[in-house]
């Protein structure tokens, strides 16, 4: 049992660097395998070969029949299984010790650099490199080791190898023994003179232990699979969380500016247009700053604009040599705007605006009255 205690001490150190599933797996390994194998199973198989009897007196026949029936003892087979299953965990523990050794070296170097920094040396870049190496090895504050990077890969590989060894030993056991023992074995092998019957002691008790160890192996395999999925999804979650933290650290929260929005429009003459629709992208509560259309300045502005438009139109007709053409009523309509509510109602009711009469304000003279019948080049034909 001295060898079992040494293995137990090594596996006990893995507890501090394992996940919850790994700790449960180690508990199953200690209690239901190592402890049970060292107490009950060895005593059940203690008289295995001495109690194996065959119905022959031929020397050496019992030995060859026992070797054919049991190529390897169940106890030794389970010991090999425990050792092979524990080796990946011990390799992971060796990696943890390597990381801890690296931590000691980095801490010692960091202390030396801090002493040099107090003396005025510029060692900020070297300290930053040490922090990066600690993060790479998974070393956190207070000497705590976190599974990331190479340490996480080693842990996943150890779980995979443990699962492979569990399946391999279960298949080997099924191929060699099966999962039950019979009371009588027939043997026909030299130097036995003929086919002989051999008898096994306590086959029922041994069958119970075989089934129990089979169940423990299946439970350990299930724990390995669950732990593998747990580590896989936890790694994805940590990676997504790390990217999210990096994104929030590099880009601050975007808050909409109060100054943003639709541009403001203003009529500098203080008069509003006939229709001033709001912008389709204007925010709620947004209103155009418009002037009062009933204001006298607005009415004067509309009249002046109408007169100017009419004068421009007449000048254009004269330049084109169409001064003698008849102006239609539609062209002669002034550009007038309703200046009060009553005119607006008339427009809505369908009243048309009358054309402005062209009044010649020049005083009539005798010559003009005499020559009124003669056309002048600047007169308009009516």
From Swiss-Prot:
Gap junction protein that acts as a regulator of bladder capacity. A gap junction consists of a cluster of closely packed pairs of transmembrane channels, the connexons, through which materials of low MW diffuse from one cell to a neighboring cell. May play a critical role in the physiology of hearing by participating in the recycling of potassium to the cochlear endolymph. Negative regulator of bladder functional capacity: acts by enhancing intercellular electrical and chemical transmission, thus sensitizing bladder muscles to cholinergic neural stimuli and causing them to contract. The chain crosses the membrane at residues 24-44, 77-97, 156-176, 208-228. The modification S-nitrosocysteine is found at residue 271. It comes from the Eukaryota. GO terms for molecular function: gap junction hemi-channel activity. The modification Phosphoserine is found at residues 5, 255, 257, 262, 306, 314, 325, 328, 330, 344, 365, 368-369, 373. Belongs to the connexin family. Alpha-type (group II) subfamily. One of its GO terms (cellular component) is plasma membrane. This is Gap junction alpha-1 protein. GO terms for biological process: cell communication by electrical coupling; cell-cell signaling; heart development; microtubule-based transport; negative regulation of cell growth.
